[in-house]
Amino acid sequence: MATARTFGPEREAEPAKEARVVGSELVDTYTVYIIQVTDGSHEWTVKHRYSDFHDLHEKLVAERKIDKNLLPPKKIIGKNSRSLVEKREKDLEVYLQKLLAAFPGVTPRVLAHFLHFHFYEINGITAALAEELFEKGEQLLGAGEVFAIGPLQLYAVTEQLQQGKPTCASGDAKTDLGHILDFTCRLKYLKVSGTEGPFGTSNIQEQLLPFDLSIFKSLHQVEISHCDAKHIRGLVASKPTLATLSVRFSATSMKEVLVPEASEFDEWEPEGTTLEGPVTAVIPTWQALTTLDLSHNSVSEIDESVKLIPKIEFLDLSHNGLLVVDNLQHLYNLVHLDLSYNKLSSLEGLHTKLGNIKTLNLAGNLLESLSGLHKLYSLVNLDLRDNRIEQMEEVRSIGSLPCLEHVSLLNNPLSIIPDYRTKVLAQFGERASEVCLDDTVTTEKELDTVEVLKAIQKAKEVKSKLSNPEKKGGEDSRLSAAPCIRPSSSPPTVAPASASLPQPILSNQGIMFVQEEALASSLSSTDSLTPEHQPIAQGCSDSLESIPAGQAASDDLRDVPGAVGGASPEHAEPEVQVVPGSGQIIFLPFTCIGYTATNQDFIQRLSTLIRQAIERQLPAWIEAANQREEGQGEQGEEEDEEEEEEEDVAENRYFEMGPPDVEEEEGGGQGEEEEEEEEDEEAEEERLALEWALGADEDFLLEHIRILKVLWCFLIHVQGSIRQFAACLVLTDFGIAVFEIPHQESRGSSQHILSSLRFVFCFPHGDLTEFGFLMPELCLVLKVRHSENTLFIISDAANLHEFHADLRSCFAPQHMAMLCSPILYGSHTSLQEFLRQLLTFYKVAGGCQERSQGCFPVYLVYSDKRMVQTAAGDYSGNIEWASCTLCSAVRRSCCAPSEAVKSAAIPYWLLLTPQHLNVIKADFNPMPNRGTHNCRNRNSFKLSRVPLSTVLLDPTRSCTQPRGAFADGHVLELLVGYRFVTAIFVLPHEKFHFLRVYNQLRASLQDLKTVVIAKTPGTGGSPQGSFADGQPAERRASNDQRPQEVPAEALAPAPAEVPAPAPAAASASGPAKTPAPAEASTSALVPEETPVEAPAPPPAEAPAQYPSEHLIQATSEENQIPSHLPACPSLRHVASLRGSAIIELFHSSIAEVENEELRHLMWSSVVFYQTPGLEVTACVLLSTKAVYFVLHDGLRRYFSEPLQDFWHQKNTDYNNSPFHISQCFVLKLSDLQSVNVGLFDQHFRLTGSTPMQVVTCLTRDSYLTHCFLQHLMVVLSSLERTPSPEPVDKDFYSEFGNKTTGKMENYELIHSSRVKFTYPSEEEIGDLTFTVAQKMAEPEKAPALSILLYVQAFQVGMPPPGCCRGPLRPKTLLLTSSEIFLLDEDCVHYPLPEFAKEPPQRDRYRLDDGRRVRDLDRVLMGYQTYPQALTLVFDDVQGHDLMGSVTLDHFGEVPGGPARASQGREVQWQVFVPSAESREKLISLLARQWEALCGRELPVELTG
C-alpha cells in the first residue's frame, strides 16, 4: 500500500526512478519481459517483448540521438533459450537504467509511455490529462456532459500544484497544466470513481489517496464513490454553487462530508443562527444544495451536520447503519427521504421531524409498528417492503393519510395472510381506488370487494347503534340470509339448520372473509327503525305501475327488505325511496359467493340435500320416461287433455320442496302452450339421453355424488310463467340441482345462508336438451325436456364460462351435437361480437366501431312523481319533490306502453360503450323447439341507445342519508335526459364496476356533456323566488330569448353556403327557432325581455387553504352576466352565486378531477368551429386541468345526439326539481394545442386537435382577454413536467441541463408547456386594410388608409313586435382617418387550424357598410334599450357612398333591419360597444377626426 507523500516546501527532492527487469515469461512463440518500475513508494509492473524495446530504441535514436549500440543485439537462432533470456534480462535492465539516467529531468514521451508513466507517475498522468483536455475540453464543456476522473489523477494534479514547477516543463504546449486548471474552473458536472484494492498493476491504493477539489470553481453536481472522505479536501469551496452531491462507499459519518472542519473545532454553529454559547467556529451553509445522496456508506447516525443543508429536498441515506431517525427537523424543505436498508426499529414521533415529506422509503429495516406514520399527511409514496410487520392493524396507521397513493408491503409477515391485498386496501376506506399496492394496479374485483365491505361495515355500525341491549349474543353471531318479503299467503319454508355451520371460503375473485354481524347487516336495508317497528309490506302486483296518489299511506312507504331508506319517528323529513316493491326486487347477496366447490363442509351439506331429493326423485324420473315412451304415438288429442297430461308429467319429473300454495302460485298463471308434434329424431334423442342418465347403478349414484361446480346466480325460470329468484346451481356428475336463496322474512332474523337454502328441483344431464348463451358472457340458457322449461342463468362472465365448460365436459362428444342450439351462442362468441351483430341489426351508424366497456343486469325503475303521495304540506317545494317514493312502472323507449306492464319486473342489461348507454331487453318467453329456427333471431332483443353525455348520477340523492348495505351495494339513481331512473343491480360488485367504468367514460368524452347545477335551497324568499307567482322553470324558460339565427337583409344574390342545422320543433320550453342560411346571417343575440337579477345568497365559509380569499373575491366580482348577453335560468342561477358558493358549484357540478382547482371565471359569448353561425352565452371556468364552458340551453339541439321522446321530454319531475340541467363543454388543457389572439385583444380562440375542440371566446373587451390569457399561462406553467423523485435510468446529471423556456418568434410564443400563443401580425392588419380598400368606391386611396380603431361590437336592429329591445348583430367596427366601416368577421375559422384541409367557404372579412367621417352629422348617446348605445347619424350624401362596388342595401324596409330616416336624407347606425373603454375611445377618436375634417366640434346629443 502506497503512503501519501508529504506536502509543503520542506519536502525532500524527488527520488530517482528505477526500472528493473524482474523476470520473463513465454507467450505463444515469443518471450515477454516483466519490468518493475519504482517511483518513490509507488511501484508497478510493465510487460514488453524484445521487439517493443527495439521500436523504442529506434525512436530514441531518431529523436534524442542516443547511442545505437546501447540496446542488446537481436538474435535469430535460439532466441527463446533460457541462457539467452536470462542474459538479455540483465542487458535490458542496464539499458533501461542508462535511459533513465540520461534523462533525469523530463522523461521523453516515448519512454514515458513505454514505462506507463502516463498511468502511474505524477508527471505522466498530468501530461496525459492536460493533452486530453486540450483536445476535447471545450467540446465537453459545451455539451454539458459529466466528466469522469479518478482519484489518482486528482492526486497527481494536487501534487503537481504543490511542487511549484513550471506548468509546462516538457516544452510541449499540449501538456501544459493550465489546460487542466482552465477546464476545472468551468466544469459543472464531476464524477470521481475510485477502485477497491490496488490500482492496475501497481501497489497504489487509489481510494486512500488525498486530493483537493478546490480547483473546481463552478461545480453544480458531484458524484464520489470508493474514496476516503477523510482525505478529500476542498469540496466545501463549491458550497455556493453545488446543487447535487453524491458520496457512496466513502464515508463513515455525515460530518466527514458536510463539515470536514469539525475535526479541527470542538464547538461550531451554522452561519445565520443565533449563538447561545461560546463557539470556536461559524460554518457557512451549503447555500444551493438540494439533493444529497449518502447511500452505501457506514453512517450510523444522522448528526447535527444536517443544520448546514437547510435547502435539501432529496435525501438518500439508504444502505447504512442508522438506528434512529434524528435531527431531520432542521430540513424544512425535505420532500423525498430514503432510509431503506438500515437498522430502524421504531418510528415514534416521526411526524415531528418530517414536515412536508412526500416520498418515504423505509424498506429493509426492522419495523414492526407503523404508529409513527399516522400524521404524515403530505405523504404520497411509502415503501415498507422487507420489514417485520405482522398485524393488519398496523396498516390502519397509514390508511387515513389523505394523499397516500403508492404503498409497498411486500416480504412482510402480513403479506402471506389470505386476501392480503383486499384487506390492506380496505384500510384506506373511500380512497381505496386511489391507492396502488405493491406496484400492482388494483383490479376491479378487488375494488368492488372493498366497496361492498365498506357498505357492510357501515351497515354494521348503524345496526350496532340500533340493536336491542337485551338481544342475545348468540343471535348476533349468526349469518343472515338474503332479505325477502313474500305475500302474506305464502309463509316461508326454511330447511332445518345444520349442527355445524361451515364458514365461507375465499373464491378466486378475491372475496374477503367478513364478520358475521356485518353479513347480517348487509342483507337488510338500514334505516332508523328497529326490527320490531317495521311493518311487513303488502303483496305487490306483477306490474310496477304507479300507486294512485290517495293510496300510498306513509306506513306503506316505510323501509321494507328490498327497499332503501325510510321514514322514522325521529326524522324530521322523509327519505327517498328507490325500490318499487319488495316482492319484485330480487338480487344476489354478496355474502353467499364465498361458498364454492372447494369448501368441504358446504359440499357435504349440499350432497346431503341432493341425496335426499334423489331418493324421492328417481322413481319419478323413470315413471316420466315410461310415460313419454307410451305416449309417443298418441297424437291429435283434445287441447285440455294434452294440458292435463303435460301438467302431470311436469309434476312427476320435478321434485320441489316448499309450501303447497307457493307451488300453486308458481304452477298457475298463464296457460300452457300446446305441445308441438314430436318428431322421430327427438324421440330417439330422448331415449339415448335417458339411457345415459340412468345407466349407473341407483345405489352407487346415491352414495357417490360428486359435486363439480357451484354457481351462485340470478335465475329466471320459465315454466309457462316467469319466476325469478337468487339461486345456487350445483353441477354434479349425474345432473344439476337448483337451490333458491329465500328472502329474509323479518329483519330480526339472521339465518345462515346454508340453513336458508331451499331445494327447488333437480334433473339429470339426460333431461338437458339444449344449452348455450343467450347473450355471450352474460346469460346462460339451459333448456330442459320440453321447451316450456327453460333456465336463464345470469352471473358474472368468469363463473358462467367455467360452469359452461364444466357442463360440456359432462357430455361425450357425440352428445354435444344434439345439445347445440341454432338460436344460442357458444362459448367462443364474445360480447363484442354480439354487440356488433345487435347494432348491425338495428342499423346503427358506426356500430362496427363500438366497443363494449361493460354490461350489467339491472332492474330499471323510472318515476313520474306526480302520481305519488308527497310529504306534509309544510315542506318547501324542493323538499317535497325529493321526498316522494319512486314507485312507478319500468318504462323505456325500447318497449311499447303495452309491454311495460308485462315486462316490468324483468331485468334489463345496461351496456356501456365509449359514447352511449345501451339498454338491452331480452325476450325470456319460452324458447322454441330445436329445428324451428335456422338462425339467431335478433328480434328477441330490443335496444335503446342514450348518449352517455346525457347520463348523470341523480343529484337528488343525498350522500348523507343512511341507506343500508342493499342500497349501497345494489341501488344507483341516474338522470337520463330529463328522466329519473333507478337501476337496481342484481349481482354483487356490479354497481361499483359500473360506476368505475361510467366515470372513466364520462371523463374521456370530448363533446358537450350534461351537468347538473343545484339550485339554492330555501323558500320563496330565496333567489328562485324572485320570479313572480312561483311559476315553474318551464314557463320561465319560455320567456328567455334563445340564441337563434336570423337572416340579414340582402338585395343582391350571394352564393349559398352550408345551411344551418334544421331547427327543432317548438317545445314547451321555448319558442320556435327561425331557420336561416349560415352564410347570409350571423347569430343574433336577442336579449331577455325583462332582465331579473336574483339576490346573491349569503357567502359560505371558505376552506382554510383553497380557495384563497383573493380567489373568492375575484370570482365574485367577475361573476356578472353582461347585460347584452341572453341568459337561461341555469346561467342566471350561476351568476347569482357569490363567495365560496361559486367554488362549491364548480367542484360539485362541473369539475371532473377531484384535485383540480378553479383559477378564473369569465362571462363571454362563444362560437364553436362546428356551428360558426351560432353565438351563445357561456360561463367560462378555467381550472388547473381544463377550461369549462357552461353554455346556454339553446346549444343543446345543435350538438347533442337527439334523444327519443321518452327521454328528452321535460316532465313535472324536472320542472319541480331542485336543480337545473345545463350543457357544459370541456377542453382539457392537455388537449390544448394553440391559442390565437384576435386583433386588439377583442377575442381569442382555443384550438385542440379536432374540430370539436375549437372554440372562440368573443369577449369584445381587451381587459377580459388579457386577464384570461394571463391566468391561462400561469396554469399552463404549473402543468410542466416535474422531474421524477425516483431515480431513473438516465444520466446522473441530465436533470440539470437547459430547461425549455418560452420564446417569441414571428408573433408566436411557444409556451414552456408546448402550447403555441399566436398574436396578430402586421400582415393581418395589411390584409384587413386591403379588404376594406378593395370594396371602396375609390380604391386608389387605399395606400392612404390607416386604421385608428378596431373594435368588435353589435349593431342594434329594429325591435320585433311586442319587444322593447332590438336584436344585436355582431359586427366589427373599423375607424380609419377618414372613413368608418362595419364588417362581418369570421373569428372561428381564421387563422386556419392545423387539421383544416381546405379554406373555409366564408371570407374572413365581409364589408357590410362604410361611411365617410365627414358625412357624420351628429352622435346620439344615452340610456336607450342598451346602456350607452351610440347612434351615429350620417347625411346620406349622393355620389359619396363608399360602397360603390357593393350592391347590398342594408337600409331597406325589411323588418328587423336598420331603417332610413324620413325623406331619406339621413342614415342611422345604432351601435352597441360592450367595453366601456372601447366606447370612450371610439367617441374621442371619432370626435378628433371629425373636427380635423370639418373644422368644428362633433355634435354629441344625450338622449333619455
Curated annotation (Swiss-Prot):
Residues with Phosphoserine modification: S541, S543, S546, S1022, S1284
Tissue: Isoform 1, isoform 3 and isoform 4 are expressed in brain. Isoform 1 is expressed in endocrine tissues.
Bias kind Basic and acidic residues: ranges: 463-478, 1032-1043
Sorted UniProt keywords: Acetylation, Apoptosis, Cell membrane, Coiled coil, Cytoplasm, Endosome, Leucine-rich repeat, Membrane, Phosphoprotein, Receptor, Repeat
Disulfide bonding pattern of the chain: none
Coiled coil: 634-695
Repeat (LRR) residue spans along the chain: 288-309, 311-332, 333-354, 356-377, 378-399, 403-424
Residues recorded with modification N-acetylalanine: A2
Region: Necessary for homooligomerization and targeting to endosomes, residue numbers: 120-695
Region (Interaction with PAK1): 245-869
Any one Gene Ontology cellular component term annotated for this protein: intracellular membrane-bounded organelle
Domain remarks: Both the presence of the PX domain and the coiled coil region are necessary for its endosomal targeting.
Gene name tied to this protein: NISCH
Quaternary structure and partners: Homooligomer. Interacts with GRB2. Interacts with PIK3R1; probably associates with the PI3-kinase complex. Interacts with IRS4. Found in a complex with ITGA5 and PAK1. Found in a complex with LIMK1 and PAK1. Interacts with ITGA5 (via cytoplasmic domain); this interaction is direct. Interacts with PAK1 (via kinase domain); this interaction is direct and is increased upon activation of PAK1. Interacts with LIMK1 (via PDZ and kinase domain); this interaction is direct. Interacts with LIMK2; this interaction depends on LIMK2 activity. Interacts with RAC1 (activated state).
Positions with biased composition (Acidic residues): 635-649, 661-685
Occurrences of domain PX (ranges): 11-121
Localization per Swiss-Prot or TrEMBL: Cell membrane; Cytoplasm; Early endosome; Recycling endosome
Record's function text: Acts either as the functional imidazoline-1 receptor (I1R) candidate or as a membrane-associated mediator of the I1R signaling. Binds numerous imidazoline ligands that induces initiation of cell-signaling cascades triggering to cell survival, growth and migration. Its activation by the agonist rilmenidine induces an increase in phosphorylation of mitogen-activated protein kinases MAPK1 and MAPK3 in rostral ventrolateral medulla (RVLM) neurons that exhibited rilmenidine-evoked hypotension.
Protein name: Nischarin
InterPro entries: Leu-rich_rpt, LRR_dom_sf, Nischarin_PX, PX_dom, PX_dom_sf
Record field: compositional bias (Low complexity): 1063-1078
Modified residues (Phosphothreonine): T1282
Region named Interaction with ITGA5: 709-807
Pfam families: PX (PF00787)
Annotated GO biological process: actin cytoskeleton organization; apoptotic process; negative regulation of cell migration; Rac protein signal transduction
Organism field: Homo sapiens
